[in-house]
């Protein structure tokens, strides 16, 4: 996502940085978040997107948005979704597990990955996701996302 934002020259926001302290503490303790826990975080993500739109400025933000209901909460109505692209990074759990094992300094332990995949509802055609092969290196993922975005804007 950072490589995509850099390639586009757009501001980047790491969605995990918007988690309330209670969520960070819970995940750091190895406890999966509930839908209720995620609510304030999803609202912060939505507010960031809304602020960019209101300012007429683009941006890239990361968010696991594991369920359709979460994505609907973030993206809002059809009118609110105009100009917003949902890029879905698709990879098997084993690939993500290997990446998490190498990640340092993040509050979410790799042990929570299984609960995230159990919760995951991959976006369907009605959500018009731009699906990127996340088994690739980051630069290749960014290039694929750029190509998909260009095709949409085409």
Summary of predicted features, one role per range:
Residues 36-82:
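Glycine-rich phosphate-binding loop used to anchor ATP phosphates in small-molecule kinases
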Residues 2-46:
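Conserved substrate/cofactor phosphate-moiety recognition/catalytic segment
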Residues 102-144:
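Small-molecule kinase domains that catalyze NTP-dependent phosphoryl transfer to phosphate-bearing small molecules
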Residues 11-13, 85, 128-132:
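Structural signal for short hydrophobic segments within the conserved structured cores
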Residues 80-99, 132:
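Conserved phosphate-donor/acceptor-positioning beta-strand/loop module used by diverse small-molecule
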Residues 42-46, 138-149:
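Short, amphipathic alpha-helical "lid/cap" segments that border enzyme active or binding sites
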Residues 8, 77-78, 104:
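Active-site catalytic pocket residues across diverse enzymes, especially alpha/beta-hydrolases
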Residues 18-19, 65-67, 91-95, 137:
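Conserved nucleotide-binding/hydrolysis micro-motifs of P-loop NTPases
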């Amino acid at each position: 996502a950072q490589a995509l934002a850099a390639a586009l020259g757009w501001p980047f926001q790491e969605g995990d940085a918007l988690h309330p302290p209670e969520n960070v503490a819970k995940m750091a303790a190895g406890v999966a978040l509930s839908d209720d826990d995620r609510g304030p975080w999803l609202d912060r993500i939505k507010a960031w997107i809304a602020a960019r739109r209101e300012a007429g400025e683009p941006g890239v933000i990361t968010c696991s948005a594991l369920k359709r209901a979460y994505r609907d909460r973030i993206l809002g109505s059809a009118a609110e979704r105009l100009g917003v692209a949902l890029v879905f990074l698709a990879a098997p759990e084993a690939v993500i597990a290997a990446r998490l094992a190498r990640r340092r300094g993040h509050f979410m332990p790799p042990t929570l990955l299984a609960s995230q995949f159990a919760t995951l509802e991959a976006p369907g055609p009605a959500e018009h996701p731009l699906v990127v092969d996340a088994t690739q290196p980051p630069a290749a993922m960014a290039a694929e996302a750029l190509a998909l975005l260009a095709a949409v804007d085409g």
